[in-house]
């Protein structure tokens, strides 16, 4: 028994959502990769659900020839592997054509890290604009951006976790946030005094807006989700960076998450604690920050030791 590729993809995504609790971003990524592979194979008369190992290898070779990074190729293969395992487990296939395929080797780049000084400049600029904004529309945006930044640097949340915070988390114990992360796993993260103050100022103005009682999100917006889109936050952050005299290209929500982790380790935090705060399932993901510190230490010695080579 075989299935149309489009129906097979929809069934797979439904299973990933209902049974495994996959995040919306993960589902969208799977959809893009699977539909791209299905379209490419359909042009050659092959149904993705019936594809053989050679067909899958061909799609990966095409990606490589088109200049896609090894990480993109590995992501595509991962999506296909999950897809065919689903078809096998449901009895629609007798084999897994991805079983003998290997993802191209990828070197993990060291994360970009902002210095404490530059993070300070960014936060100071956000606080200044929040205090000086007079026009109501500009004031709510400035207070929101300041609250987002202080919370992000205080907690190291993923940007999707940050913009998707329910308003209830800011109305309970202000010293901590209860965050629902990847795989629907909850964790508690402490809030700094500055973050609590910035959130409270924003929340006071937010609650005075018409319709605010009906929106469950801490950072509401006129969007499909009902909360601020992560792309909007990233764009506002880059604008703030430019106004603070920083290179906009070097600043993003993810860079601030990296800064949170790196600065904690620089000041003596242990790796396990940082792992828990970041919500990493595997400590090997967190260990990349120790490599960043090692690189900086090596550079420091090389530049300043009188007998260094």
UniProtKB/Swiss-Prot annotation:
* Start and end residues of each Core-binding (CB) domain: 3-88
Q: Give the coiled coil ranges.
A: none
Molecular function GO labels: DNA binding; tyrosine-based site-specific recombinase activity
Which family is this sequence assigned to? Belongs to the 'phage' integrase family. XerD subfamily.
PROSITE patterns cross-referenced by the UniProt entry: CB, TYR_RECOMBINASE
Tell me which HAMAP family the record gives.
Recomb_XerC_XerD, Recomb_XerD
Active site located where?
A: 158, 182, 254, 257, 280, 289
The cellular component terms of Gene Ontology attached to this UniProt record, alphabetical and capped at eight, are: cytoplasm
The record's function comment reads: Site-specific tyrosine recombinase, which acts by catalyzing the cutting and rejoining of the recombining DNA molecules. The XerC-XerD complex is essential to convert dimers of the bacterial chromosome into monomers to permit their segregation at cell division. It also contributes to the segregational stability of plasmids.
Q: How does it assemble?
A: Forms a cyclic heterotetrameric complex composed of two molecules of XerC and two molecules of XerD.
Alphabetically sorted, this entry's keywords are:
Cell cycle, Cell division, Chromosome partition, Cytoplasm, DNA integration, DNA recombination, DNA-binding
Q: Name one GO biological process term.
A: chromosome segregation
Tell me what this protein is called.
Tyrosine recombinase XerD
PANTHER family xref list? PHAGE INTEGRASE-RELATED, TYROSINE RECOMBINASE XERD
Q: Name one Pfam family in it.
A: Phage_int_SAM_1
First-listed, main subcellular location of the protein, grouped into a coarse class = cytoplasm
Q: Which domain of life is it from?
A: Bacteria
- SUPFAM superfamilies hit by this protein: DNA breaking-rejoining enzymes
The segment(s) forming the Tyr recombinase domain are 109-302
Lineage runs:
Bacteria, Pseudomonadati, Pseudomonadota, Alphaproteobacteria, Hyphomicrobiales
Q: Where in the cell is it found?
A: Cytoplasm
* Originating species: Brucella melitensis biotype 1 (strain ATCC 23456 / CCUG 17765 / NCTC 10094 / 16M)
